[in-house]
Amino acid sequence: PEALNWGYRNLAQYSGVSLGSVGYIMADLQNSGHLLDADGNWVWKDRNNTIGKWCDYYRDKLLPGIEKRRYSGTIPDNCLEYAMLPGGESAAEQLHLLKSSRLLAYRTGNINLCIAQNRWKEDIDGNIEIRTPFWPECRTFDKIPYLLIYADLLAEDDSRCTEIAGEIFNRFLSGDQ
């Protein structure tokens, strides 16, 4: 929330988008009523609703365009030591919220060694999905943001994932904290 009041240059640098894009996005958030001016500071009108709208957009527009590869294979315990960050169920498993038989990860570098060592085979219906990050290279993470974990779980359209997404929302995202 404090980032709402950063200067546009800082927001552009942090997010990896152009200064013009930051201006457009902030104007859109203000004009659509998502942001309110509270004595010179921007605040969310309904942060939870805005998160929900972003997750819908992610599922319907952004996710279909993300480059992804699917594989079948065994998921080794150390697989995330390779150039990958866990998303969705895999991230929820690291938070000890569920046990998953699938791997969803965003590659952060070359994962060919992982594929070869574990003998993963390309398979459109495989239990392993590796996605190309959709954020700019200048923006590095040591873990996937909770908002993305939440959105990935909701995009699964599975009751178990939806329940876990609710736990993540309540623990890390709810504006009622």
Feature names for model-found ranges:
Residues 1-52:
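Loop-centered beta-sheet repeat module
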Residues 36-74:
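HTH-adjacent hinge/linker in prokaryotic transcriptional regulators
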Residues 58-177:
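Long, low-complexity, charge-rich intrinsically disordered regions
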